[in-house]
């Protein structure tokens, strides 16, 4: 049974697009972090409950769980459990950012500098306009690790695992439906060469497995 036909990106496409990587951060910096956090909450509800665009068709939540199960071998009930986990993270993004930054005033991240409660000047500067993610095929749960990136006003370059393109595409549909600019996220399906190109081109990367 054919579940989907996924067009493959090539390294040259990513090399071309990375010339405009700064645009991903620029469009996100035009939106206050508190508004991006609210978009994450809306996106979480859409991801869990809505029928969303996928390619030239649409995908319901049940379609998603069934297709992910078929391509990864993960039982459907585990696929739905991971959906609920992703939804939980998106719906508690304000608390997660507070924990990750140890209670830092979010306006300091927006400006890049500020003063701590104890009166110490601090500065945070982005080291890359985008974070590259080389994602696995067999562990959909790792997607929670990149969800805080967009509300921190950093763009995403996603290289999906060959057997698990479902989550990146559904998340992209939910994010953009919730108001996140499309320029902030790029998805580049492909083989090992695309994973290597993602690592090579992005200033900051998280990688899982060999592809």
Tell where the protein language model's regions lie, with residue ranges.
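Rossmann-like NAD(P) dinucleotide-binding subdomain of oxidoreductase/dehydrogenase enzymes
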Residues: 104-211
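N-terminal Rossmann-like NAD(P)+-binding subdomain of aldehyde/semialdehyde dehydrogenases
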Residues: 1-117
């Amino acid at each position: 049974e054919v579940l989907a036909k996924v067009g493959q990106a090539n390294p040259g496409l990513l090399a071309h697009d990375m010339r405009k990587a700064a645009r991903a951060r620029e469009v996100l910096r035009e939106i206050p972090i508190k508004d991006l956090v609210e978009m994450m909450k809306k996106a979480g509800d859409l991801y869990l409950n809505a029928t969303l665009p996928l390619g030239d068709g649409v995908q319901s939540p049940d379609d998603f769980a069934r297709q992910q199960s078929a391509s990864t071998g993960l039982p459907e009930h585990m696929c739905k459990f991971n959906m609920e986990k992703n939804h939980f993270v998106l719906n508690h993004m304000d608390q997660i950012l507070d924990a990750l930054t140890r209670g830092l005033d979010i306006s300091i991240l927006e400006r890049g500098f500020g003063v701590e409660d104890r009166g110490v000047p601090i500065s945070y500067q982005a080291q890359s306009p985008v974070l590259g993610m080389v994602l696995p095929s067999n562990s959909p749960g790792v997607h929670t690790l990149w969800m805080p990136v967009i509300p921190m006003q950093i763009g995403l370059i996603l290289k999906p695992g060959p057997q698990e393109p479902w989550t990146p595409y559904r998340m992209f549909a939910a994010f953009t439906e919730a108001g996140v600019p499309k320029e902030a996220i790029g998805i580049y399906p492909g083989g090992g060469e695309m994973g290597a190109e993602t690592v090579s081109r992005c200033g900051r990367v998280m990688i899982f497995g060999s592809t």
